[in-house]
Amino acid sequence: MNVLVIGAGGREHALAYKLNQSNLVKQEFVIPGNEAMTPIAEVHTEISESNHQGILDFAKQQNVDWVVIGPEQPLIDGLADILRANGFKVFGPNKQAAQIEGSKLFAKKIMKKYNIPTADYKEVERKKDALTYIENCELPVVVKKDGLAAGKGVIIADTIEAARSAIEIMYGDEEEGTVVFETFLEGEEFSLMTFVNGDLAVPFDCIAQDHKRAFDHDEGPNTGGMGAYCPVPHISDDVLKLTNETIAQPIAKAMLNEGYQFFGVLYIGAILTKDGPKVIEFNARFGDPEAQVLLSRMESDLMQHIIDLDEGKRTEFKWKNESIVGVMLASKGYPDAYEKGHKVSGFDLNENYFVSGLKKQGDTFVTSGGRVILAIGKGDNVQDAQRDAYEKVSQIQSDHLFYRHDIANKALQLK
């Protein structure tokens, strides 16, 4: 069959890499993709992921059987709806169901209605109300801007001054807009991907742990993710089972009950508190960089899993008996302002590197984004995989990238 992947980042690079391994996939295309994907797929950087008509025309011309949508923005903009209306099979939720990521308030309200464990919250619609609320709220407080923010719309404020600063950042020059305040939850965070078709929810039996903060020791601002690893040895199978029973199954049923037909992967960003697992966030697609490490460890056929889900079958995932660690290299300055156009070399175009923000300039690759390239390490255990990942990092040549030195340290400290 002919498969089209939508997106240009490392997550889509990993999806294309994994789908390319399937005997079911005859031809693979990526829109817009990036030049690092050319060994595994036909890349069409001339079509943007926001050009829905261009994508539809291409899918018709190439007799595409399945479209796999990677990033959140096309989902929230309704690309899946347009493709389905024209007879294409799509892995990714429709516009209505994608609200579970597109609106933090939508997600909080549905969790509250169906008693799905999450932090207590308060929503405000005006800047002055936000400033009033923080005068007497419990600290630390989590401040979230409603809507998409590329993983950077969340600030944890430890003091009233920090909360005021967060409000200024969220509102800018505007006086109105939805901001959600949440009680700060303490515990161990983890990411659970769940394949969902209506009220059928099939969670991965392998979880990943992301590293959101920019710098070592979980310092600095939130980012889209600076690295990840799987499996997570200090999150037990019992916790995974409980997360499935109290979060994954109930949210699938709740969405369907509310009239939202979700088909695709639901990312559950969870935290293991003293009261059990609770939801931090939902995403309507694979995590990035979690997808890169999980799909590197997946032994079974991703395309077959997608078809099984479409047919309402409880698909069974199979995993390699190894640990995977992924370390993200980012442009200096990220997640704030950063320069583009700097040369990066020393890496091979293979399964050891997934590219997020590079483009070809002549014969060389130059930076084109904040997060640039993820180095993948593999080993019999987390320690060996971590060592291998940083060995891969050391091979990359550039004076304009930075990375965290402690990805997966938590697994080593808590084992």
From Swiss-Prot:
Q: How is the cofactor bound?
A: Binds 1 Mg(2+) or Mn(2+) ion per subunit.
Keywords of this entry: ATP-binding, Ligase, Magnesium, Manganese, Metal-binding, Nucleotide-binding, Purine biosynthesis
Q: Which residues bind Mg(2+)?
A: E281, N283
Reported cofactor(s): Mg(2+); Mn(2+)
Q: In which pathway does it act?
A: Purine metabolism; IMP biosynthesis via de novo pathway; N(1)-(5-phospho-D-ribosyl)glycinamide from 5-phospho-alpha-D-ribose 1-diphosphate: step 2/2
Top EC category: ligase
Catalytic reaction equation(s): 5-phospho-beta-D-ribosylamine + glycine + ATP = N(1)-(5-phospho-beta-D-ribosyl)glycinamide + ADP + phosphate + H(+)
Q: What is its EC number?
A: 6.3.4.13
Q: Where is the ATP-grasp domain?
A: 108-311
Q: List the disulfide bonds.
A: none
Q: Name one GO biological process term.
A: 'de novo' IMP biosynthetic process
Question: What terms describe the molecular function in GO for this protein?
Answer: ATP binding; metal ion binding; phosphoribosylamine-glycine ligase activity
Pfam families annotated for this entry?
GARS_A (PF01071), GARS_C (PF02843), GARS_N (PF02844)
Q: Where does ATP bind?
A: 134-191
* PANTHER family listed in its UniProt record: PHOSPHORIBOSYLAMINE--GLYCINE LIGASE (PTHR43472), PHOSPHORIBOSYLAMINE--GLYCINE LIGASE, CHLOROPLASTIC (PTHR43472:SF1)
What family is reported?
Belongs to the GARS family.
Q: Which NCBIfam families does the UniProt record give?
A: purD
Q: What is this protein called?
A: Phosphoribosylamine--glycine ligase
- Species of origin reads Staphylococcus aureus (strain Mu50 / ATCC 700699)
Gene name? purD
